[in-house]
Amino acid sequence: MKRIAFLSAACLLMLGTACQRGPVAPVATQSKVVEDGGTGPYKVLMLEDPSLEAHTIFAPQNLAPFGKKNPLPVLVWGNGACTNSPWEHYKFLNEIASHGFLVIATGYIPMEEKPYRGPMSTSAQQIESIDWAIAQNADKNSPYYGRIDVENIAAAGMSCGGLQTLDNATDPRLKTIMICNSGLFINPGTAVPNMPMPSKDRLQEITVPVIYILGGPEDIAYENGMDDFHRLVKVPAFAANYPVGHGGTYRQEHGGEFTVPALGWLQWQLKGDKEAAKLFQGADCGLVNREGWTVEKNDLID
């Protein structure tokens, strides 16, 4: 009896994850397996959780492998056009999640691959995603209890979603930010109404590493994004360009080529992966040797 009691106490001390047997599934009101769950080591489910309205979650189908020794870092995502659904980006986000990340996208789950026509999303929805992840990690009744790495959270977004990310960039819970096909407007008068519009001064308030992933000079956000990058002199900053224009490669199989720097950056910044760091560090970094990519970085990257 004493031995049983001791083992039970040990399980509690290890956040209840190490002693559980069998798979642990996330809660979902509706869900979909995208591209066989991704190519990473953890098959993913795209789902809607009843406790987080107007958000889409990409989570491992089985949460059992995650716990104190292998927690899930978090990526919160804002969509292009500030659309309230990740319908253009779900393949890209699904692939990232399959490599051991909890991805929470702003907006309603895209059960069908068709444009979302509802109202725009808001910057606050990214903050809701962060709040939810932290609360789930602390909730003993949640399947995510003790499985989320709340010390390693990234915010990212594409186009208008990138502006939402920059709007939230000073949140102290963020470890890094990733800006895709976006940048603060050099001329705010050219912006679409209702877009978040922080001034360029916001860049000097950022205290975490930043990566810009852009579509080359044909990308309508190229000048704004590169201008941002050149202003970031106090934090590690990296700019990667792939010549596909503003739309990126998100809708291609497994998110296409944009997944390479995005995943590598998150593995480096949120998991401390030294192999992933080689994509970005050094004069002969891995990404510069990958066909099609051009890169710039400041001295703080190396």
Language model regions located:
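Short amphipathic alpha-helix adjacent to the substrate-entry channel of hydrolases
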Residues: 87-106
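N-terminal cap/lid segment of alpha/beta-hydrolase-fold proteins
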Residues: 23-70
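C-terminal motif of bacterial Sec signal peptides marking the signal peptidase cleavage site
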Residues: 15-18
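Alpha/beta-hydrolase-fold serine-hydrolase catalytic core, especially in secreted/extracellular enzymes
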Residues: 235, 244-247, 252-302
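Short beta-strand element of the alpha/beta-hydrolase
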Residues: 69-80
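Hydrolases whose catalytic domains are alpha/beta-hydrolase-1, hotdog thioesterase
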Residues: 164-168
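Gly/Ser-rich "nucleophile elbow"/oxyanion-hole loop immediately N-terminal to the catalytic nucleophile
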Residues: 64-71, 115-163
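The feature captures the conserved acid-bearing segment of alpha/beta-hydrolase catalytic domains
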Residues: 175-252
